[in-house]
Amino acid sequence: MKFKDSALAHEILDNSDVIIEIGASAHNPFNIKSESYFNVDLPKKYREVYEQESEVLGEGIATVDVEVTGVDLPFPDNYADAIMSSHVIEHFFNPIKALREWYRVIKPGGYIYIICPHKDRTFDKGREVTTISEIIERLDIPYLEDGAQHYTVWRTDDFVKMVKAFGFVVTHVQDVDDKVGNGFTVVIQKQHGI
């Protein structure tokens, strides 16, 4: 079962030189046209749950080019035109640390393209929304993410408020993402260093 392509992702990102996707999946590829495309994902021992799910969905397992967590990327500053993720940011205990790292790696004018599960359209429905104050408390807590659970839960407006509170510039928002439909899309553009 493959999901449709995102028209918004193609509009913004097609023909980029370098794209990095955090946590790509074979059953839900973005199919963006670029010169270089890297899939960054957790080391193999942490990917077992996702690989089993991909096998069940019948599309095989996405090839991983770089095995690291998404908070410590082995790319130089201003390297990529875009970093993309779909249903990944909620797995970070400290999502701002991840976003700051992704921001470091993208070029000025580049994009961070995020699809995140919407609290009311996923199994997170019964959970409380993660507040900005909770995120602030997590900033200095060292924690090794195992990637298997949702540490954060948002609705579209909560996520947008959070990223803006930390100085990120949001250029595009879809309350219902145009790829899977159970999340929302937020696109951040690099204007200057944070």
Task: Mark where each language-model region is.
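Conserved alpha-helix/loop element of class I SAM-dependent methyltransferases that forms part
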Residues: 1-16
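Class I SAM-dependent methyltransferase SAM/SAH-binding core
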Residues: 18-72
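Hydrophobic beta-strand segment of the Class I
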Residues: 83-84
